[in-house]
């Protein structure tokens, strides 16, 4: 799904927080490591999800493919990578258009008096070089999500099917949908 830009499983909802303050948002998966059950996406270090993950590293991810009629729910433990070998490797693979997100002066969610991209006018239309985009690296993070368990649900008119996979305890079971 990660290498297939058209896959619905490439853009899950990521949900993090605690009992009284949780939030969800769409993320774009960038890499997976099936051997270690890790998936990762990029974020801005100034995003409020980083603050939430620093308080509680446990999160959930929700995937849904309407055509396949499949829903997958993951329970994950997150690691925030910032200015380390993991972010360096990912930053080098991040394209010109994607780097633009990390060039804003103020972090995501900062209030503004007017509608804005947050970019300086000279950057708003991709009028910057890859070299100039290096300034954004200081804001770039890679969030790695270690999958602890997941549930699979297939929706069918003749009857749904549901299964749970506990990766920590190596247990699988069918569930009533």
List each language-model region with its residue ranges.
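Charged, gly/pro-rich active-site loop segments
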Residues: 71-177
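An N-terminal domain-cap segment
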Residues: 1-36, 40, 51-52
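Short acidic, glycine-rich loop/turn motifs
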Residues: 16-20, 63-67, 154-156, 167
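Sequence-level motif detector for i,i+2 pairs with an aromatic at +2
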Residues: 9-11, 24, 36, 69, ...
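A short, aromatic/hydrophobic, helix- or strand-capping loop or linear motif
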Residues: 5, 10, 64-65, 103
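A short mixed-secondary-structure module that forms the rim of ligand-binding clefts
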Residues: 30-69
């Amino acid at each position: 799904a990660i290498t297939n830009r058209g896959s619905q499983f490439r853009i899950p909802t990521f949900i993090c927080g605690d009992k009284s303050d949780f939030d969800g948002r769409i993320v774009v998966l960038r890499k997976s490591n099936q051997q270690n059950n890790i998936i990762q996406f990029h974020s801005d270090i100034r995003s409020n999800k980083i603050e939430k993950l620093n308080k509680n590293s446990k999160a959930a991810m929700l995937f849904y493919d309407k055509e396949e009629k499949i829903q997958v729910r993951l329970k994950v433990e997150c690691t925030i990578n910032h200015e380390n070998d993991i972010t360096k490797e990912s930053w080098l693979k991040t394209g010109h258009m994607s780097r633009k997100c990390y060039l804003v002066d103020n972090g995501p969610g900062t209030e503004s008096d007017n509608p804005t991209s947050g970019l300086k006018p000279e950057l708003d239309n991709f009028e910057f070089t890859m070299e100039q985009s290096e300034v954004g690296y200081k804001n770039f993070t890679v969030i790695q999500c270690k999958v602890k368990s997941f549930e699979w649900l297939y929706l069918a008119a003749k009857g749904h099917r549901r299964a749970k996979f506990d990766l920590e305890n190596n247990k699988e079971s069918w569930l009533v949908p």
